[in-house]
Each structure stands twice: as structure tokens, then as C-alpha cells.
Amino acid sequence: MQNPYLVLSGPVRGVVYTAPVIFEVRLSVRGITESDDKELSLLAARLVNLSYNPLESLLIKKSYTSRLSTLDFEHGNIVYSVEATISVKVISGPPDGFYGEFAAATDSLKCEILLHSSGFEERHLAGDEIKLSRSVVSVESFGKLIVSVRASDGSVTLTGTKKFRPLEKGITTGRLRIAKLCQLEFTVAWSLFSYSGT
């Protein structure tokens, strides 16, 4: 998992692509006060128009140039998808806690989406509910959701993954033990996308 320069959170829900989708981006470099902020990028861009309905999920990468910068977009078009809302609870771990990085992917698109990174500032303790920066992802209804974790107590870093088979509705739970470092419980709430054809 990469540590990007900019961590963008959201969208809170998936975007149903039935009409043109416009992304609006405004990035600023923070100054000491809000009036000292400097514009880095101001962009409104139309999502690549898929003039056909693909039968397989695909990853679309496109660059957009604004007056002051170029932004690289990466968009996953997930076919026949359901929405997965993920939550994480720490069942056990070291007394001083651990640092964690959480990501999700599908088995067809191996591109990981960062759900949360505690860095070296936020320690997770037994009993904690981890507040994910991003908790909603889209998954093919016939595929698998793969949640991966990289956990560290400061001296050792270990990884683990947990797979979930999607449902149209309902809740799935599963536990992940990362060697002797920690045990986590994942809860995934499944739902269909709701959209109007008008």
C-alpha cells in the first residue's frame, strides 16, 4: 500500500453511472490563515464516457490538466455490483496497541483502495472500533471482497487478508488473526445500489 501525498476521502457511497458524471476538484495549499491559501487546482471534468456496457469490471486511468496542475484519476467501473459498508473492531492486541493500515480490493480488480491509515500517531487498542476514513466500496455480486491489513507494534510489521463473498442484502462478519499481534473482527453490511432510471 502506498502513502500518497494527498489522501482523499469519500465518496461516502458509490456512484451509479447511468448518466454523465462530473468530478469537481478544488485543491489549495494551506496558508497560515484561510486568506493565505493558494489555489493549486480548480477542475471540473467529465468522467470518461463509456458508450457501451462492459461485461467485465475495468480500471480506467485518465489525466486532466487544469490551469496550474495535472490530476491523475483512477476510476473502477464495477459491473453487477453491490455496496459493502465495512466496519472493524479490535478483539485483541498488544497492551500498548498497534498501528494499522486497512485496504480493500475485489478479486477481479487487484487495485487496493485505502480505507484507513493510522500512521504512527493513532494506536488501536483491544475493544476499539476503528473509524475508517473510507468505509464503503463496490464489489461484483459474483466476486469477492478482499480486505487487507498491515499492522505494526513498532518493532514488527505483519500483514493479513480476509475474503468475503457478497450478498444482495444482509450482514457478514469475519475474524482475522494477524499472527501473535492482533485479532480483528470485520462486519460488512451489504446492499444493492438504488437509482432512478429517470
Residue ranges and their predicted role:
Residues 1-198:
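Peripheral membrane interaction modules
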